[in-house]
């Protein structure tokens, strides 16, 4: 596996953290725009508030990222509490378990799946009243206090139309806010400057500019990029597996076609993103256990248009075209534009073969994985019919076992262990006590978490 590992090691990051975040927000907006705009308003206000507080111990970009994703639990179907992620009348602030469980999911998703790490613990007790004592022992309580205040203000502005904030912001949720941060917010919002930005929708561009300045280390950026695959799980687990496997096959085929590191990086990024538009495809279609009707197939095929919309302006144009064309065929029988082979680039041809190889060799909602012989037979026929490039498909036909072995090797590297997220969330769902502050205090250590050890006994 040394050669495929070398190819993997040669890849360079194409998308910046800012671009990844923008793309991810468009994905979430494809599920529920109201929740996404609530997050945007919250993040904008949290950014401005944090700057006003001027506490060097606060990580502004992490607070903004937490704010943007703090409602992730609302984007997935919840069969236990009968929640549909497409609902328009959302309750964000109840202390009932049907609500608090969503923030617990967000907490552990962001802890294990993003660079936020322990900062995400700010969401664990998100809907509980502000605790002044906890603020002195756990920095996450500060993050929570900032984001919660801004989320409540976001909700108030949304539900009260043209009204401005009450003179005393504490009236929105008596006993739930940090008075220090309320004072800081009033300073930041002097003459209603922040509220006016939100009412005029000018805050989005301003926040977007800040998001573009966010930086992370390469390994942390890779974690963020994987969100673009794993957010698909809010609609279909099969689609997540397929996106990873198609990326593995693309890398194997690209390496055999002699692509240089720059070309391999473009191909791999295209493969990671190739089905991103399925986030906007109805779940009933993605998970349908049989052959789709012509009408539903038309809806399914529209995912390439959704991909183009989601990636537009946030991704190099060539990668967008690779994604948009991954269902085109050399003989013009593909979709959406029936582009012929003379107009399809080498990378687009490779991505098509990788996508088909994964589709045939994976289990899907409507089929089990095909046998090696059946997979080869289908690819052979598609090649003979002029749909696939024989210079590429020959590697699948002649070196199938090795390519599959490479896929399995790469999959273990590229996939993320989601079990910890599910374990913590399940533990919360199926216990009566829920998450107690004690669990956080047990993990407090050093000067980062405890400002005054002598006060700990007073809690």
Question: What do the PLM-derived regions correspond to, one by one?
Answer:
Residues 2-459:
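Histidine- and acidic-residue-rich, metal-dependent catalytic cores
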């Amino acid at each position: 596996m040394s050669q495929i590992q070398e190819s993997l090691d040669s890849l360079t990051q194409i998308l910046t953290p800012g671009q990844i975040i923008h793309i991810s927000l468009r994905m979430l907006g494809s599920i529920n725009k109201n929740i996404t705009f609530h997050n945007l308003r919250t993040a904008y206000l949290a950014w401005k508030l944090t700057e006003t507080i001027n506490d060097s111990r606060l990580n502004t970009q992490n607070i903004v990222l937490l704010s943007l994703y703090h409602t992730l639990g609302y984007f997935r179907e919840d069969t236990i509490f009968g929640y549909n992620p497409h609902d328009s009348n959302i309750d964000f602030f109840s202390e009932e378990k049907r609500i608090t469980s969503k923030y617990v999911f967000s907490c552990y998703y962001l802890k294990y799946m993003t660079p936020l790490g322990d900062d995400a613990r700010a969401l664990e007790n998100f809907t509980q009243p502000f605790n002044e004592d906890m603020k002195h022992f756990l920095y996450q309580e500060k993050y929570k206090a900032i984001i919660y205040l801004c989320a409540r203000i976001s909700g108030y502005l949304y539900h009260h139309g043209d009204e401005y904030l009450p003179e005393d912001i504490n009236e929105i949720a008596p006993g739930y806010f940090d008075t220090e941060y309320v004072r800081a917010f009033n300073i930041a919002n002097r003459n209603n400057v922040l509220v006016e930005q939100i009412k005029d929708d000018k805050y989005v561009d301003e926040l977007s500019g800040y998001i573009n300045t966010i930086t992370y280390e390469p390994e942390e950026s890779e974690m963020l990029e994987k969100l673009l695959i794993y957010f698909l799980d809010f609609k279909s687990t099969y689609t997540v597996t397929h996106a990873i496997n198609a990326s593995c096959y693309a890398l194997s085929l690209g390496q055999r076609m002699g692509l240089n590191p720059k070309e391999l990086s473009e191909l791999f990024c295209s493969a990671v993103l190739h089905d991103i538009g399925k986030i906007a495809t109805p779940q009933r279609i993605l998970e349908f256990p049989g052959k789709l009707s012509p009408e539903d197939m038309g809806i399914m095929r529209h995912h390439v248009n959704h991909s183009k919309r989601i990636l537009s302006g946030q991704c190099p144009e060539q990668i967008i075209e690779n994604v948009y064309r991954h269902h085109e065929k050399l003989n013009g029988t593909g979709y959406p534009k029936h582009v012929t082979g003379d107009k399809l680039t080498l990378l687009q041809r490779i991505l098509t073969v990788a996508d088909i190889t994964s589709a045939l060799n994976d289990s899907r909602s409507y089929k089990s994985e095909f046998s090696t012989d059946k997979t080869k037979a289908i690819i052979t026929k598609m090649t003979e019919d002029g749909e696939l490039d024989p210079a590429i498909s020959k590697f699948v036909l002649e070196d199938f076992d090795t390519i599959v072995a490479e896929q399995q090797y790469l999959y273990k590297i590229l996939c993320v262990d989601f079990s910890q997220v599910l374990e913590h969330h399940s533990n919360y769902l199926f216990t009566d006590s829920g998450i107690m502050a004690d669990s956080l205090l047990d993990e407090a250590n050093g000067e980062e978490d405890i400002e005054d050890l002598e006060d700990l006994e007073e809690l």
